[in-house]
From Swiss-Prot:
PANTHER family per UniProt: URONATE ISOMERASE
Keyword Isomerase applies: yes
EC number: 5.3.1.12
Disulfide bonds: none
Reactions accelerated catalytically: D-glucuronate = D-fructuronate; aldehydo-D-galacturonate = keto-D-tagaturonate
UniProt protein name: Uronate isomerase
Recorded metabolic or biological pathway in which this protein acts: Carbohydrate metabolism; pentose and glucuronate interconversion
UniProt-listed GO biological process terms: D-galacturonate catabolic process; D-glucuronate catabolic process
Family: Belongs to the metallo-dependent hydrolases superfamily. Uronate isomerase family.
Keywords (A to Z) from UniProt: Isomerase
Gene name in the database record: uxaC
GO molecular function: glucuronate isomerase activity
Length: 467
């Protein structure tokens, strides 16, 4: 019987262990997509206690606590920090079988060094005191944790109207050598069907000093913001796509009419919504291509399912799930439209429904081109798939239908500074998969070949892709 989460956790053979400890373990972290608040990095936030750094904003944990029967007051409500922590301590032992159980113990090991204690009600007080003392030390500030976890790059998620003042402050601080770059997330401008679309365009008008009275004026306003992001080191755009929309792009006159209708609060047809979305996405893709930005598309979430809780807590509070819409044809036509003039940017496609894995893994092969290895990527297991089975499925299907060796690897996609341990989780799973290939005679026992591939997937490929 193996010890729980020992040094060889998830590594069942000598090849896997060699790949992990000699090649993967000490690779830096290039975290190209996350939701960390840049303000907290700029100000080098010190966290008051474990609740602040561990539970605030973590909807994975919130969902588990709700499933365990805890009242919302001790999850997102007005209960004290210690009461929320105690509720979490009572929840964790109920999470065996869920990746949260592994993540929780990894997050205590790194950076806090707690390796010999199971987390639960019996150990909660001791861990609370020990970790809270550490959190008051500079090494456990926001920047300190990033350094301890060997982070080299962090790509935050930012709206076109954001000032990027904190990114500027970070870049100008010579005492901090980790690159923190904004990522362009223009969903509120692209999704013309949203109730808040007109309010958002008014904000965009103010920050861009542009009267948005036509589709061309909208592009000019966004172009000013694109240039602002580019000046602040942006390397990537990100699109959350519940629905992949496509329609042949109409002429500018029709796009102006669609925008005028929406700005006067008139209802649009599904065709008009699709025409607007396609036109704007294709134009944005061209602009990304000019700047050598990567375009990330997160496809297939069914969001804000619980109306009562959405009214109480808003979005991103743990009430989203996997959608089951099909999107192969509109995605293909959207990418093809960008590619017809050789203006398809580097692209990473993520699907939330694992049913779509093979479709995405084959779709990326349609648009690979010379000059950029792995130009179109099948993104790492996302959200509900960033667990052992989900990561294995994505890695296996990518290796079977594409080139695993060109994969840009893992990302945290997280709001927590403790989530960097997900890179360790991914690296162990990757090394175990490749190690099994060798043991089964499916890959050569060539550590130079396989070790370099592992190092590239863990760090080098992403570093090259987002240059």
């Amino acid at each position: 019987m193996k010890q729980f989460m020992d040094e060889d956790f998830l590594l069942s053979n000598d090849v896997a262990r060699t790949l992990y400890f000699d090649y993967a373990k000490d690779q830096p972290i290039f975290d190209y997509h996350c939701h960390l608040p840049p303000k907290e990095i700029a100000e080098n936030r010190l966290f008051k206690d474990l609740t602040e750094i561990w539970l605030a904003g973590d909807h994975y944990k919130w969902r588990a606590m709700r499933s365990a029967g805890f009242d919302e007051n001790v999850i997102t409500g007005n209960a004290s920090a210690y009461e929320k922590y105690q509720a979490w301590a009572k929840t964790v032992p109920l999470c065996i079988g869920n990746p949260i159980y592994h993540w929780t113990h990894l997050e205590l090991r790194r950076p806090f060094g707690i390796t010999d204690t199971l987390f639960g009600p019996q150990s909660a007080d001791k861990i609370w005191q020990e970790c809270n003392e550490l959190l008051q030390q500079p090494e456990f500030s926001a920047r300190g944790i990033m350094r301890r976890m060997n982070v080299k790059f962090s790509g935050t998620t930012d709206d076109p109207i954001d000032s990027l003042e904190y990114h500027k402050a970070i870049a100008e601080d010579n005492a901090f050598d980790i690159e923190v770059a904004p990522s362009w997330r223009p969903d509120k401008a692209v999704k013309i069907e949203l109730d808040q679309f007109n309010d958002y365009l008014e904000q965009l008008e103010r920050v861009s000093d542009t009267d948005i009275n036509s589709f061309d004026a909208l592009k000019k306003a966004l172009l000013k913001r694109l240039e602002h992001f580019d000046q602040h080191g942006c390397k990537s755009a990100d699109h959350g796509m519940e629905i992949v929309r496509f329609a042949p792009i109409p002429d500018e006159k029709e796009l102006d009419r669609i925008l005028r209708l929406r700005r006067s609060n008139q209802a649009l047809t599904e065709l008009q919504i699709n025409q607007y979305s396609t036109a704007l996405l294709v134009w944005l893709g061209t602009e990304y291509c000019k700047r050598n930005w990567a375009m990330q598309m997160h496809i297939g979430a069914l969001r804000n399912n619980n109306t009562r809780m959405f009214k109480l807590l808003g979005a991103d509070a743990g009430f989203d799930s996997i959608a089951d819409r099909t999107f192969a044809e509109p995605l293909s036509r959207l990418l093809d439209t960008m590619d017809q003039n050789d203006e398809l940017p580097k692209t990473i496609l993520y699907c939330l429904n694992p049913r779509d894995n093979e479709m995405i893994a084959t779709m990326i092969g349609n648009f690979q081109t010379g000059g950029v290895a792995g130009k179109i990527q099948f993104g790492s297991g996302w959200w509900f798939n960033d667990q052992k089975d989900g990561m294995e499925r994505q890695l296996q299907q990518l290796s079977q239908l594409g080139l695993l060796s060109q994969f840009v690897g893992m990302l945290t996609d997280s709001r927590s500074f403790l989530s960097y341990t997900r890179h360790e989780y991914f690296r162990r799973i990757l090394c175990e998969m490749v190690g099994k290939w060798v043991v089964n005679g499916e890959a050569p026992n060539d550590m130079n070949l396989l070790g370099n591939m592992v190092k590239n997937i863990c760090y080098n490929n992403a570093k090259s892709y987002f240059k």
